[in-house]
C-alpha cells in the first residue's frame, strides 16, 4: 500500500520561465500604488484608488476602488507592469556571453508564446535582445582581433632558434 512514492510533476520541465528559473524575483519588488493604478487603467480597468497590493510568487493581487465606489480585486500577471520590462532588459544587458543570451532568448520565446505581453513591451524586449546580440558580436570580434594582434606581436618576441 505504501511501497512506491508518487513523484509529483515528474515530466514537467523545470525553469521554463523567468520566475521559476529564479532569474527574476517579482515577489521582492516594491510596487507603488501609482504604477499599479496606471497599469490597470492601461489594461482597461476603471480604477479610482488602490486599496491593497499583495505580491505573490507568480502573480499580484490588487484590491482597488472603482469609479462607482465599489471594492474590486483581482489577480494580475507581473508581465503587464513596466517594472517587469525593466527587469528583463537588465537581465539581458547583464548576459556576459552568447550561451547565456541564447538561454534567455529561448526562455523569452516560450514566455511570448505562453503569456500575454503588451505588444510594445514584446517589441522592446525583442529589440533589447537584438542589441545585446550585436554588442556581444562586436566584443567577440574585438577579442579575436586583439588575440590576432597579440599573436603577431608575440612573433617578434620569440627567441631565435637556429636550425643547426
Question: Could you say what each language-model-derived stretch is?
Answer:
Residues 79, 83-117:
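Amphipathic alpha-helical packing elements
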Residues 59-88, 118-155:
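Repeat-associated, polar segments at repeat-unit boundaries in modular proteins
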Residues 35, 51-58, 102-112, 124-137, ...:
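Amphipathic alpha-helical segments in structured regions that serve as interaction surfaces
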Residues 159-164:
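Short acidic DE-rich linear segments
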Residues 42, 46, 94-98, 110-114, ...:
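Surface-exposed polar/charged interaction patches
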Residues 37-40, 85, 89, 105, ...:
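Residue-level detector of alpha-helical secondary structure
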Residues 5-83:
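N-terminal accessory interaction module
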Amino acid at each position: 500500500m505504501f511501497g512506491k512514492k508518487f513523484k509529483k510533476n515528474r515530466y514537467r520541465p523545470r525553469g521554463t520561465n523567468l520566475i521559476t528559473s529564479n532569474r527574476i524575483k517579482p515577489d521582492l519588488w516594491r510596487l507603488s500604488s501609482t504604477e499599479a493604478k496606471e497599469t490597470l487603467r492601461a489594461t482597461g480597468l476603471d480604477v479610482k484608488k488602490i486599496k491593497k497590493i499583495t505580491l505573490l510568487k507568480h502573480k499580484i493581487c490588487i484590491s482597488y476602488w472603482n469609479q462607482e465606489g465599489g471594492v474590486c480585486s483581482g489577480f494580475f500577471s507581473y508581465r503587464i507592469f513596466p517594472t517587469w520590462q525593466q527587469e528583463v532588459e537588465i537581465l539581458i544587458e547583464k548576459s556576459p556571453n552568447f550561451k547565456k543570451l541564447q538561454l534567455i532568448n529561448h526562455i523569452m520565446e516560450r514566455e511570448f508564446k505562453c503569456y500575454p505581453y503588451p505588444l510594445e513591451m514584446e517589441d522592446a524586449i525583442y529589440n533589447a535582445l537584438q542589441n545585446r546580440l550585436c554588442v556581444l558580436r562586436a566584443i567577440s570580434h574585438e577579442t579575436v582581433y586583439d588575440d590576432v594582434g597579440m599573436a603577431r606581436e608575440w612573433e617578434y618576441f620569440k627567441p631565435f632558434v637556429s636550425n643547426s
